From Swiss-Prot:
The gene is ndk. It is found in: Cytoplasm. GO terms for biological process: CTP biosynthetic process; GTP biosynthetic process; UTP biosynthetic process. It comes from Ruegeria sp. (strain TM1040). It catalyses: a 2'-deoxyribonucleoside 5'-diphosphate + ATP = a 2'-deoxyribonucleoside 5'-triphosphate + ADP; a ribonucleoside 5'-diphosphate + ATP = a ribonucleoside 5'-triphosphate + ADP. Keywords: ATP-binding, Cytoplasm, Kinase, Magnesium, Metal-binding, Nucleotide metabolism, Nucleotide-binding, Phosphoprotein, Transferase. One of its GO terms (cellular component) is cytoplasm. This is Nucleoside diphosphate kinase. Pfam families: NDK (PF00334). PANTHER family: NUCLEOSIDE DIPHOSPHATE KINASE (PTHR11349). Belongs to the NDK family. Homotetramer. The active site is at 117 (pros-phosphohistidine intermediate). Its cofactor is Mg(2+). One of its GO terms (molecular function) is nucleoside diphosphate kinase activity.
Length: 140
């Protein structure tokens, strides 16, 4: 597998409960390196633009409210097959369906407050990374 980068967000439900370190440990234990990371408080407008692909979905407004309700940690993860590996570590969107040992199985509170976001493809990873980071901030 090729070395690749993916984008991750540790969401407000997890940052409120001080789970950033525990979640980062899961990434690192799986062989992913954190090559960029910052804690930010997204505005509702930033969240809306980031999740614009979901604008027509019934949960869009609630998602934007949630993502701007408290700080998040945005990060770039690097490793062999990083996109697929991150999605495996995160677990299913619904924590009730997430495999034991995954981030969502251990930490998520609900489908809406599921602790993490991860890119689903190389194209979206590149777009999502560029939304939050300049090339100078990627220090892997």
């Amino acid at each position: 597998m090729a070395l690749e980068r993916t984008f991750s967000i540790i969401k407000p439900d997890a940052t409120r409960r001080n789970l950033t370190g525990a979640i980062n440990a899961k990434f690192e234990e799986a062989g992913l390196r954190i090559v960029a990371q910052k804690r930010i408080h997204m505005t509702k407008a930033q969240a809306g633009k980031f999740y614009a692909v979901h604008a027509e979905r019934p949960f869009y407004d609630e998602l934007c409210e949630f993502m701007s309700s408290a700080p998040v940690v945005v990060q770039v993860l690097e490793g062999e097959g990083a996109i697929a590996k991150n999605r495996e570590i995160m677990g299913a969107t619904n924590p009730a369906d997430a495999a034991p040992g995954t981030i969502r199985a251990e930490f998520a509170e609900s489908v809406g407050e599921n602790s993490v976001h991860g890119s689903d493809a190389p194209e979206t990873a590149a777009e999502e990374i560029a939304y939050f980071f300049s090339g100078l901030e990627l220090v892997g």
